[in-house]
Amino acid sequence: MSDSLVVCEVDPELKETLRKFRFRKETNNAAIIMKVDKDRQMVVLEDELQNISPEELKLELPERQPRFVVYSYKYVHDDGRVSYPLCFIFSSPVGCKPEQQMMYAGSKNRLVQTAELTKVFEIRTTDDLTETWLKEKLAFFR
């Protein structure tokens, strides 16, 4: 049945990369960008970036193709505390091919569960990814 929702597996190498990323000791912003390998029907690592702001990260994301991002962000709270939340960002741009959109949407929950993340956000255009947007989203989790 070609119309059924395709849920992709998570590449075992990516699982290990996500595990290491979760327990990283560095205190800078960092990101893992992931994509769906359509032929293998698997979510795979596309890139790993260090010392990257939200504004720089958005330049790394394609404007017309979906991507998954796990972003470690140095968050300075209003009271001066510093935390390093891991954020899952699903970049799902308007204008993507419907079958590609479905493949990513169908795989999102499995990837979130695999990465054990609770801060899950979605953007419909890469322009939305700014530090202001991220802080607004994170303020909900105080």
Curated annotation (Swiss-Prot):
Protein's recorded name: Glia maturation factor gamma
Q: Which CDD domains match?
A: ADF_GMF-beta_like
Q: Which residues form the signal peptide?
A: none
Family assignment from sequence similarity: Belongs to the actin-binding proteins ADF family. GMF subfamily.
- State a single Gene Ontology molecular function: actin binding
What's the source species for this entry?
Mus musculus
Whether Acetylation counts among this entry's keywords is: yes
Any single GO BP term: negative regulation of Arp2/3 complex-mediated actin nucleation
Q: Which Pfam family, an example, fits this chain?
A: Cofilin_ADF
Modified-residue entries (N-acetylserine), positions: 2
Q: Give the highest taxon in the source lineage.
A: Eukaryota
UniProt keyword terms in alphabetical order: Acetylation, Growth factor
Where does the ADF-H domain lie? Answer: 4-139
* Cystine crosslinks: none
Which InterPro entries does UniProt cross-reference here? Answer: ADF-H (IPR002108), ADF-H/Gelsolin-like_dom_sf (IPR029006), GMF (IPR011171)
